[in-house]
C-alpha cells in the first residue's frame, strides 16, 4: 500500500503547486496595462458571446440586482451523487460581477432586486420535494451578498485585494458572516467567479455507514477589468468512508486546479461584421485517487468519523449545512443566511490543508501500516494511545523524498531486537527497510534470515529474490562468532542423549541441548553444515533395526527438526560436509554414497566407492575441496573423491600397520592418528597436494583409549571417554599441548565431537 499512500499525499503537493501557479499568473496579469475603455449596457450580451466563443455556456439572464447563476462546475469527489431531477451542485454557480454601471442603472437594479426577491419568495412554495435543498439556496440567492462571497466596493477601479482576502477564507471550516449592509452590488461586470464547492455532509438517520468529507478551497484571484478577466480556483478534497463495525476504511482524495484568463485587444468595435475580439486561456486540472486500508483502526479514528454519512445532494456550507433541520425550510434558511453569524461552532467539521496533514501525522492509524510486524508500544497510562502519538523525537514525521511525502516509522537500534518478524514477512520488511533507509529494521530482517538459513534457502520467494551479496551476507552472519567444541553423548541403552559444549577459556563443559529420543541410536553419525548439526540415525529399538531418519539442530534458535531421510539406512557411516552438501559414505555392508542438497532437502546417490570396496569402521574428512577416506576395512588404502569431477581415486595410505583412529584436515594438511598398545599415539601428516605421509608427533601412553577428533581453528581436540587431548596443528612444529584438558563429565554412551558457532548468552534472539 505504499504507492497508494504516495498518491494520496502527492495530491496535496500538486494542489500546493497549483496555488503557486495561479498566484504567479494573477500577478503577471495585474502588471499588464489595462485599456481605459468602459463597457456600456451591452455588457451582458458581450459576456454571452465571449462565453459561447470560449466553449462555456452563456450565463442566465436575470435582473441586474440578482447574482446570476451559470454552468455548474464538475466536482472531483465521487463519494455522493444526486438523484435525477435534483442538482447536487451549488445553485449559485459562477457569479457575474459587473463594473462600470451608471447611477440610473443602480436605481433600476435596486428596484429589480426587490421585485426579484419577492418573486422568488412567492415561488418557493411550489418547488417539488426532490429539490428542497435547491429551493433553500434559491431563496438565499435573493440576498445581494452571499454568506461566503464579499461585497465589492462602489468604485469601478477598486482593487480586488479585498475580494481575494475575503474569498481566501476557509470555506470548509465555517461560514463567513454576511455584511451588515444589504445593498446589491453597484458595479455589475463581466468577471466570472466559480465559487468553491464545499462538501459538508448532512446527517442521515438510520444510516449504517460513517462518511466524512473535507474540502479545502482557496480562491487565488478574481479580477475583471474592461479589457480582460482572470479567475482562478483550487479545491482539495479528502473523503473518509467506513462501514460501522467493519475494520476497513476508504480514503478518497480529490484535487482541482483551474485558471481562466480572458484578453481583449480591440478597444473600439467598428462595424457589425464578426471579428476577433480577444483570447481566452482556460487551464483545468482534476485528479482523484482512492485508497482502501484493511485492518483494525484505533479508537482515535472515531474522532474523525463521528459525523453520519452524507445525504445527496450535499448542501452548501453557507446555507447552514451543519444544522439538523430540514433542507426545505426556506424561511429558516433565509433568516440564517441574512442574520450575522458568529464564529464556527465546535460541531462544524472544517479543516485546512495544514491541519489535515498534521492530523494524519499525529494519527498513525491514518498512515500506511506495514502488515506482518509490530512495534512494541511504550508504557502509557492511556490504553487507547498509539506508539508515536506523543510529542517526541520518535513520533512519525513527514519527509520530502523525490517530491513525495513518506511517513517514516520510528525505530531505534534498541527496539530492533523486539520487532516481531517471521519467515513469512522478513523479505517484505527488508524491502520496506531498504526503501525507507531504516538500518535497524534491515539488520533485524537479516538476523531472522541468518538464524533460519535453511528455511530461507529452501524458499524461492525469499532466497530467489536476494542478491548474491545478500546471500553471502546472511551466511557469513550465521557463521560469525566464537566456535566451540560440541560433543554429543549418545546412549542407546538408556534411550537418552545430550549435547555439551566445551569452554576452553574456563576449561569447563556446559550443557547445550537434549537429543530427541528419535535421534538416539547405535552407530549414528554427526556433522555440522552451515552451523547446523545433522544427525544420521543408525540402528534403533530393541531389535537394532537400521533407520534412515536424519535430524537437524539449529543452535541459534535451539530447535530440532527432521529433514529428508536417506534413500537407504546406513549404520556406522561417515558424514562429511563439502561445498554446501553432506556426503554419507559407506555403512555396514555398503559401498554406496549419498549426497544431501539442503536447498532441495533431498538425498541423491553419488558415485560409489571404487573397486566395490565396503567401508566400515573407517574415517573420512574433507580437504582442498576433496574427500579423503581411509581406515577400518580400508586398511593401507586412501580413497580420494573430487566433487567437481564426481569420481573416486584409490591410492596407498602409507604409514604403519597400526590401527587408524581418526583423520582430520587443517590448513591443507591431513593428520592421521594411529593407535599402538605399547607406544601410544602416533601422528602422521601429509599435504593434500603431494600426498606424502610422514610422522610429525607422538604421545606416549600405554593402552590408549579410542577417541574421535574435531578441529577448532588450528587445534585438534581428541575426545575420549576418559581423557581429552589437544593437538596444535602448527605448520612448522605440530605437537600435543602438554596440559591435559578436563574430560567429558559422566559419559553415558558414545561420544561424537563436532564444531558449532554458538551465540553469546547476553545476545537477544529475535522471536520467530
Swiss-Prot record:
Q: Which Gene3D superfamilies match?
A: Kelch-type beta propeller (2.120.10.80)
Q: Which residues form a coiled coil?
A: none
Origin superkingdom? Eukaryota
Which residues does the annotation flag as glycosylated? 248
- Entries under CDD domains matching the protein: BACK_KBTBD11_CMLAP
Keywords noted in UniProt: Glycoprotein, Kelch repeat, Membrane, Phosphoprotein, Repeat, Transmembrane, Transmembrane helix
Q: Which residues carry this modification: Phosphoserine?
A: 77, 356
This chain belongs to which protein, by name? Kelch domain-containing protein 7A
- Give the lineage: Eukaryota, Metazoa, Chordata, Craniata, Vertebrata
Question: Quick one: which gene encodes this?
Answer: KLHDC7A
Amino acid at each position: 500500500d505504499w504507492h497508494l499512500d504516495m498518491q494520496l499525499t502527492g495530491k496535496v503537493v500538486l494542489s500546493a503547486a497549483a496555488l503557486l501557479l495561479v498566484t504567479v499568473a494573477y500577478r503577471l496579469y495585474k502588471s499588464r496595462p489595462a485599456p481605459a475603455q468602459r463597457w456600456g449596457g451591452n455588457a451582458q450580451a458581450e459576456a454571452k458571446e465571449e462565453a459561447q466563443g470560449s466553449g462555456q455556456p452563456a450565463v442566465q439572464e436575470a435582473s441586474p440586482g440578482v447574482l446570476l447563476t451559470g454552468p455548474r462546475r464538475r466536482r472531483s469527489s465521487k463519494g455522493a451523487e444526486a438523484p435525477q431531477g435534483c442538482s447536487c451542485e451549488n445553485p449559485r454557480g459562477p457569479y457575474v460581477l459587473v463594473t462600470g454601471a451608471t447611477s440610473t442603472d443602480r436605481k433600476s437594479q435596486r428596484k429589480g432586486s426587490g421585485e426579484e426577491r419577492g418573486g422568488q419568495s412567492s415561488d418557493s412554495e411550489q418547488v417539488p420535494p426532490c429539490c428542497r435543498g435547491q429551493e433553500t439556496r434559491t431563496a438565499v440567492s435573493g440576498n445581494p451578498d452571499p454568506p461566503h462571497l464579499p461585497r465589492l466596493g462602489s468604485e469601478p477601479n477598486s482593487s480586488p485585494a479585498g475580494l481575494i482576502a475575503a474569498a481566501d477564507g476557509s470555506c470548509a471550516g465555517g461560514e463567513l458572516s454576511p455584511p451588515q449592509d444589504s445593498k446589491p452590488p453597484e458595479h455589475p461586470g463581466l468577471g466570472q467567479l466559480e465559487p468553491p464547492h464545499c462538501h459538508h455532509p448532512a446527517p442521515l438517520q438510520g444510516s449504517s455507514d460513517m462518511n466524512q468529507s473535507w474540502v479545502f478551497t482557496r480562491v487565488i484571484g478574481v479580477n475583471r477589468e474592461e479589457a480582460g478577466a482572470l479567475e482562478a480556483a483550487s479545491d482539495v478534497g479528502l473523503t473518509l468512508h467506513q462501514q460501522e463495525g467493519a475494520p476497513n476504511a476508504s480514503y478518497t482524495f480529490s484535487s482541482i486546479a483551474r485558471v481562466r484568463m480572458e484578453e481583449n485587444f480591440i478597444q473600439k468595435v467598428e462595424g457589425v461584421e464578426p471579428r476577433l475580439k480577444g483570447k481566452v486561456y482556460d487551464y483545468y486540472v482534476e485528479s482523484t485517487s482512492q485508497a482502501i486500508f484493511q485492518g483494525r483502526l484505533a479508537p482515535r479514528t472515531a474522532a474523525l468519523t463521528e459525523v453520519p454519512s452524507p445525504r445527496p445532494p450535499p448542501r452548501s456550507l453557507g446555507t447552514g449545512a451543519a444544522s439538523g433541520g430540514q433542507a426545505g425550510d426556506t424561511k429558516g434558511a433565509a433568516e440564517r443566511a441574512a442574520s450575522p453569524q458568529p464564529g464556527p461552532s465546535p460541531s462544524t467539521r472544517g479543516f485546512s490543508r495544514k491541519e489535515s496533514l498534521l492530523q494524519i501525522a499525529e494519527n498513525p492509524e491514518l498512515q500506511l501500516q506495514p502488515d506482518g510486524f509490530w512495534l512494541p508500544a511504550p508504557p502509557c497510562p492511556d490504553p487507547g494511545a498509539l506508539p508515536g502519538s506523543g510529542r517526541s523525537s520518535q513520533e512519525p514525521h513527514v519527509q520530502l523524498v523525490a517530491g513525495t511525502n513518506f511517513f517514516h516509522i520510528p525505530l531505534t537500534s534498541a527496539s530492533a531486537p523486539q520487532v516481531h518478524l517471521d519467515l513469512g514477512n522478513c523479505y517484505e520488511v527488508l524491502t520496506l527497510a531498504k526503501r525507507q533507509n531504516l538500518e535497524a529494521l534491515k539488520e533485524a530482517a537479516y538476523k531472522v534470515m541468518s538464524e533460519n538459513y535453511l528455511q530461507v534457502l529452501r524458499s524461492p520467494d525469499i532466497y530467489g529474490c536476494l542478491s548474491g551479496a545478500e546471500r553471502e551476507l546472511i551466511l557469513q552472519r550465521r557463521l560469525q562468532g566464537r566456535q566451540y567444541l560440541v560433543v554429543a553423548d549418545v546412549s542407546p541403552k538408556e534411550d537418552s542423549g545430550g549435547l555439551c559444549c566445551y569452554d576452553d577459556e574456563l576449561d569447563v563443559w556446559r550443557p547445550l541441548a537434549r537429543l530427541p529420543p528419535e535421534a538416539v541410536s547405535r552407530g549414528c553419525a554427526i556433522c555440522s553444515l552451515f552451523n547446523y548439526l545433522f544427525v544420521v540415525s543408525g540402528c534403533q529399538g530393541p531389535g537394532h533395526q537400521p533407520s534412515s531418519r536424519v535430524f537437524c539442530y539449529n543452535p541459534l534458535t535451539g530447535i530440532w527438526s527432521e529433514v529428508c531421510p536417506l534413500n537407504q539406512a546406513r549404520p556406522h557411516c561417515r558424514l562429511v560436509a563439502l561445498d554446501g552438501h553432506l556426503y554419507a559414505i559407506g555403512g555396514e555392508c555398503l559401498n554406496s554414497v549419498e549426497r544431501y542438497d539442503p536447498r532441495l532437502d533431498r538425498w541423491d546417490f553419488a558415485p560409489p566407492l571404487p573397486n566395490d570396496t565396503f567401508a566400515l569402521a573407517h574415517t573420512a574428512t574433507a580437504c582442498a575441496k576433496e574427500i579423503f577416506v581411509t581406515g577400518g576395512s580400508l586398511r593401507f588404502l586412501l580413497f580420494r573423491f573430487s566433487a567437481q569431477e564426481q569420481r573416486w581415486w584409490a591410492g596407498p595410505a602409507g604409514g604403519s600397520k597400526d590401527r587408524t583412529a581418526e583423520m582430520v584436515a587443517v590448513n591443507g594438511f591431513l593428520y592421521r592418528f594411529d593407535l599402538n598398545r605399547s607406544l601410544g599415539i602416533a601422528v602422521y601428516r601429509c599435504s593434500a597436494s603431494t600426498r606424502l605421509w610422514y610422522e610429525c608427533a607422538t604421545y606416549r601412553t600405554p593402552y590408549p583409549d579410542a577417541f574421535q577428533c574435531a578441529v577448532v581453528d588450528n587445534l585438534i581436540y581428541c575426545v575420549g571417554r576418559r581423557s581429552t587431548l589437544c593437538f596444535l596443528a602448527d605448520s612448522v612444529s605440530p605437537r600435543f599441548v602438554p596440559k591435559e584438558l578436563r574430560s567429558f563429565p559422566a559419559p553415558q554412551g558414545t561420544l561424537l565431537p563436532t564444531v558449532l558457532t554458538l551465540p553469546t548468552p547476553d545476545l537477544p534472539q529475535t522471536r520467530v
